[in-house]
A protein has these predicted regions:
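N-terminal positive-inside, membrane-proximal cytosolic segments immediately preceding the first
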Residues: 1-2
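Long, compositionally biased, intrinsically disordered regions
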Residues: 5-250
Length: 250
């Protein structure tokens, strides 16, 4: 494992390309079933949940784990990347924050895939949905458990399905431990980029760390985990650190 240092945001561009390509591909792959038994409705909803969960993990990853950015961030290529450290303040997000941000993303975007079940309603069925509640657990993978009531009715008959689950093969605790160690070490020399230390940390964590210099005083850090895959694409997690180069080395 190794560090790649560059002044052009190649690593970030790759992450954006993957996210765009992944989403476009999945748009084509989502199929609306032509038949309307409960099994088909359940399968369609499950496929949307799986797709949106993967997209949420990928999208939040290239924005430092956030769906809605914190107050301090830098905007790069339409992405709002949070500062985890600015020379004084430690703004590293705990796991519960990353879980909440994933839940926001899924809840906000799920209906983009479900399309309000219009293909069912067009057949004369009535569909009612309740609020989405999520339980997200971080381990070697991300485990999503959802309570999402979907009631399908026709004349005097109705049926409700309400529990769904999926997992995404991304090791978030490993990512959290990596960025927390980077920030703790950065506090020792707030205005010094610790290339040697980052090399050692990348080897220890079995990740790749890419640095991209932007905006004169900011550096983007991208942690790439080849063992955490979303449809065979390595997971990427990007955050920013702000430096005062007039005090470099201090």
């Amino acid at each position: 494992m190794f560090i790649i240092v560059g002044i052009i945001m190649l690593g970030l561009a790759g992450g954006i390309f993957f996210l765009t390509k992944y989403t476009a591909t999945k748009d084509l792959e989502t199929e609306i079933p032509s038949q309307l038994p409960i099994a088909s409705i359940s399968s369609f909803t499950q496929s949307c949940i799986e797709r949106i969960a993967k997209e949420a993990v990928a999208q939040n990853g290239v924005q430092g784990g956030y769906f809605e950015p914190p107050p301090e961030y830098v905007e790069v290529a339409n992405l709002k990347i949070p500062y985890f450290y600015d020379g004084k303040n430690d703004a590293t997000p705990p796991s519960r924050t990353l879980q909440k941000e994933l839940a926001k993303n899924v809840q906000r975007n799920l209906n983009n895939c479900l399309q309000d079940f219009s293909f069912i309603k067009d057949q004369g069925y009535t569909v009612e949905t309740g609020p989405i509640q999520s339980d997200i657990i971080f381990g070697d993978s991300i485990f999503f458990d959802f309570t999402f009531p979907v009631t399908i009715s026709a004349e005097t008959t109705s049926k409700t399905i309400d529990t769904f689950s999926t997992r995404v093969n991304v090791n978030i605790p490993k990512i959290i431990d990596t960025y927390e160690q980077i920030i703790e070490q950065q506090k020792i020399k707030p205005n010094f980029v610790m290339v040697s230390y980052l090399n050692d940390l990348a080897l220890e964590k079995e990740v790749r760390i890419e640095l991209n210099y932007i905006d004169g005083d900011s550096v983007l850090y991208t942690i790439i985990d080849q063992d955490s895959l979303i449809d065979e694409h390595p997971y990427q997690f990007t955050f920013a650190i702000k430096y005062d180069w007039t005090k470099e080395g201090k």
